[in-house]
């Protein structure tokens, strides 16, 4: 049975792919769950159009991620003042991904989502310089140094 996938299916393909599957798998699993449609000329044209729009969106997303990467690299490092720091250098609280995003925005960087920020550990709990990686796109990531300093 020849089908066009309308959803990503593990070990089979992604949206818009034309696949050949056994009749029972298509009739009893893929079609009832709306994961595929029967291949026809009209459906194939629609799938090709969806694939083209997805490819242009992927190119646009990659270009946008590269622009953000250049803006972040231009910053070099970001200072993050923390109000509550002990004399030993440990923080009473912790620095989260949201704090890093706010510091980047305050330093003149782009507005980012805190979910793309990957801290070395779950939270930063000490004063000093810490490398932070940001996953902007599945193929693009950038590293930024965050200087956590005690505010006096």
Curated annotation (Swiss-Prot):
Entry superkingdom: Bacteria
Q: Does the keyword DNA-binding apply?
A: no
Q: Which InterPro entries match?
A: Ribosomal_bL9 (IPR000244), Ribosomal_bL9/RNase_H1_N (IPR009027), Ribosomal_bL9_bac/chp (IPR020594), Ribosomal_bL9_C (IPR020069), Ribosomal_bL9_C_sf (IPR036791), Ribosomal_bL9_N (IPR020070), Ribosomal_bL9_N_sf (IPR036935)
Query: Which keywords does UniProt give here?
Result: Ribonucleoprotein, Ribosomal protein, RNA-binding, rRNA-binding
> What Gene Ontology terms describe where this protein resides (cellular component)?
ribonucleoprotein complex; ribosome
Enumerate the PROSITE patterns for this protein.
Answer: RIBOSOMAL_L9 (PS00651)
Signal sequence residues: none
One GO term of the biological process aspect: translation
Per its record, what are the GO molecular function terms? Answer: rRNA binding; structural constituent of ribosome
| Family as reported in the entry's similarity comment | Belongs to the bacterial ribosomal protein bL9 family.
Say what the protein does: Binds to the 23S rRNA.
Q: Which PANTHER family match?
A: 50S RIBOSOMAL PROTEIN L9
Q: By what name is this protein known?
A: Large ribosomal subunit protein bL9
